[in-house]
Amino acid sequence: MAYAVEIIGDARMKDLLKGCSAINYHTHKADINGICVELNCQNKDFIDMWSDNFYHMSDHVRPHARIYCVEDDSELHAEYHIESFTMFLFNFDYYGWIKSVALGLAGNILERSHGIYSVHGAAIDIDGRGVTLIAPSKTGKTTQSWGLLRMDNSHLISDDWYFVQFGNGRPRITGSEKNCYIDADIGDVWEEYKPLVTGVKFDNKGRGIGNVRWIRGEGAVIPKSSVSVIILLKRDKEDPAIERRLGVDEALEYLESHDFCNPHQLVRGERDLALRREFFRRYLSECAVFMVNTVCTAEESQERIRKLIKEVI
């Protein structure tokens, strides 16, 4: 994780809240799969991005989780009061971390209290069947998921984070964001996305909130699906295998060895990790699972991924 998270007690939280009460914050509430997460921040640009990024929660709803952004002389870090799901972010200058913390907070509540689990991955509905790409950073997850969105009868659930619930039939998934936090170069591989960036205000990291509906139409984003196919990605030039089907144990071992492909797990106690381990074991067991090694060009990797998907759906 790029930032350290310290778990704090009641006394420290009260001290921090007292200090925050003297700050004139911009405030906005997000609806993240039914969880109300409130952002308190002095940076108006972050508030505007947050408002574009997430579905809105009524101001009359009290927050289930809160984020306070603090600027002081300390190092970049976060302090987390688990009992109240309150996070203090010190000197965060990157919106991507703030929104991931919000998703992590919502995930904590849903995981602990509702049996709903988080996946840091992309999910696309193709002809009514859910496909997810889960991968470590820099292996092409975003590129390949946006490539799949170019298919006929495809709809975006999420390009970054979604929630999973079990029941009758295949695992059910729900998206987390209204609009996507995209890179300025999103159109470099898939040219049809070049017009998407024209109306986006990009931050100091070259990223901004983009609305894929501008390109794919109003129905391009849907809230839910059920998953049939899990694609794991890696980029390993030493491995001659480009694509193959995986068993549950091998797939779970890969995910565990890469921190479940989620650097924004805010709590990592043994109980929490055991819950996630058992979740992923069940999730993998109820879907067809493949590994794709993205050492080829983006276009060739896309062809291979589509071929694997068509074997199942």
Where are the regions a protein language model picked out?
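Non-catalytic, well-ordered alpha-helical scaffold segments
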Residues: 63-65, 100, 224-228
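A short, charged
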Residues: 66-74, 78, 83, 117, ...
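Catalytic micro-motifs at enzyme active sites that drive phosphoryl/nucleotidyl and oxygen chemistry
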Residues: 76-77, 111-112, 119-122, 135
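Conserved lysine of the Walker
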Residues: 141
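N-terminal pre-Walker A segment at the start of P-loop NTPase domains
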Residues: 97-118
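Glycine-rich, often acidic-flanked micro-motifs
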Residues: 2-27, 120-136, 150-313
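Post-Walker A alpha-helix
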Residues: 144-145
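Long, basic/Gly/Ser/Thr-rich N-terminal segments
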Residues: 1-98, 302-313
